[in-house]
């Protein structure tokens, strides 16, 4: 929210403070896992742009991984734990703008394709919420209009699950789906892709 509101000084101050606190873990070889694409983008790219001379920020940036990216890397290098099972329904997967901005490919889709026999529909468009912008009363209807193509595509897939790496985008898509005609029921909640993987493990 501070970045969206243009408070770059506070964002830079936070970057320096957090990066300094995380440096011992980074130096110990720990990966820093971001659960949402916006956080990963901030740590990887936006903080280094705001404080380019700070070595702690540079180190944190290099150590940061999006959680889906991290799981895919583990699957490729070490393999995943046994026990993945097919799901009881298909998944409409939204790829958030901040995932695409990281230039790491469709890591959430790649991760979900590790699930046996998965029926996966990938939606690669803006959901319309725009961070905190789309949840305000004055912008909400406009945000729904922007996200209508995504909501329509998600509704037309008639998949049991809707997933997005961005919690705000997932909730926004469901709100849009409620306004789009369709025979299949709208899911009660949107899941993070990692939650879908957990379901496939029976968790």
Predicted region positions:
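Iron-sulfur cluster-binding electron-transfer modules in prokaryotic oxidoreductases
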Residues: 1-203
């Amino acid at each position: 929210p501070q970045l969206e509101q243009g408070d770059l000084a506070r964002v830079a101050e936070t970057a320096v403070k957090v990066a300094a606190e995380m440096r011992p873990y980074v130096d110990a070889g720990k990966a820093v896992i971001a659960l949402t694409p916006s956080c990963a983008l901030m740590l990887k790219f936006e903080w280094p742009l705001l404080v380019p001379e700070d070595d702690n920020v540079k180190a944190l940036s290099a150590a940061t991984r999006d959680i889906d990216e991290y799981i895919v890397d583990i699957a490729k290098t070490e393999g995943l734990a046994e026990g993945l099972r097919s799901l009881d329904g298909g998944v409409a997967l939204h790829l958030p703008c901040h995932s695409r901005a990281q230039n790491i490919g469709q890591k959430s889709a790649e991760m979900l394709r590790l699930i046996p026999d998965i029926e996966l529909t990938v939606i690669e468009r803006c959901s319309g919420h725009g961070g905190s912008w789309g949840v305000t009363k004055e912008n909400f209807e406009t945000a729904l209009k922007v996200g209508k193509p995504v909501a329509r595509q998600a509704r037309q897939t008639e998949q049991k699950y809707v997933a997005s790496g961005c919690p705000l985008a997932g909730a926004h898509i469901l709100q849009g789906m409620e306004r789009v005609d369709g025979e299949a029921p709208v899911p009660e909640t949107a899941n993070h892709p990692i939650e879908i993987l957990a379901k496939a493990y029976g968790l």
